[in-house]
């Protein structure tokens, strides 16, 4: 029996060692924690969008995800450095995905049919695949996936909420336009739309809701709660876009846009006005603030449910 016992011990050791090697190799494939890392193999990437990720040293078990989307002329690294999300990730344990636009001016494609359609093969599709990769690799909490962005990234935030409403629990929009407002009649990618930018694309809540819902035909499930920021002195994306964005989501959620539940002046700070239509929609209008409204990380954490 001794030879058999020896062989059994050797076999168990070999299997154990092999498992350790496989585990080590698997871990090595994951981005290093505590710094911004590029991911190049996240899956189908129809528009060659760059993926960068920040995994905190203090990663929670079953962590949440925030997708943080940069502005025109920006990069993933610039938004990583200029926004508070990586620092907040260390405090709350979530993962941050920083997509990077593939276009020369670094604006996002919020204009083509592909990007304005669920699984349509545009920028929105690439970003959604980044989220799916992260969920699979890190076993994240699928009920705690959020999206936010500034300027062009705010536009894409609205688009992501409309094209993938089943993916996100909430979104925060810093100085954007309504989803579909930049739609290109010639189906151009990342097209600029001066009519929309200047606040001249005006519609009813019902019409805007139709635009948003058409981005995922047939979908009738839950949609992300939306918080909309805009400044009264914005000369890039004119202030009327605040009204149109709020009208869009009020229409989507079935709120009466003209009868909000509450209007609070000087909240969350002086010269800001917070309008709440219901638990799914809140707008914050900043008097005297230009483009873009500064990110309020603590309020974002409260809206996303990471903090009270």
UniProtKB/Swiss-Prot annotation:
Record organism: Aspergillus clavatus (strain ATCC 1007 / CBS 513.65 / DSM 816 / NCTC 3887 / NRRL 1 / QM 1276 / 107)
Signal sequence interval, chain numbering: 1-19
Keyword Cytoplasm found: no
Entry keywords, A to Z: Carbohydrate metabolism, Cellulose degradation, Glycoprotein, Hydrolase, Polysaccharide degradation, Secreted, Serine esterase, Signal
Chief location category: secreted
Transmembrane intervals: none
UniProt-annotated location(s): Secreted
The protein, known as: Probable acetylxylan esterase A
Top-level class of the enzyme under EC nomenclature: hydrolase
Family, as annotated: Belongs to the carbohydrate esterase 1 (CE1) family. AxeA subfamily.
Gene Ontology molecular function: acetylxylan esterase activity
Active site per database record: 151 (charge relay system)
Listed GO CC annotations: extracellular region
Residue positions with a glycan: 141, 193
Annotated coiled-coil segments of the chain: none
Catalytic activity annotation: Deacetylation of xylans and xylo-oligosaccharides
Pfam families: Esterase_PHB (PF10503)
Pathway: Glycan degradation; xylan degradation
Quaternary assembly: Monomer.
GO annotation terms (biological process): cellulose catabolic process; xylan catabolic process
Keyword Glycoprotein in annotation: yes
Functional summary from the UniProt entry: Acetylxylan esterase involved in the hydrolysis of xylan, a major structural heterogeneous polysaccharide found in plant biomass representing the second most abundant polysaccharide in the biosphere, after cellulose. Degrades acetylated xylans by cleaving acetyl side groups from the hetero-xylan backbone.
Record-listed E.C. numbers: 3.1.1.72
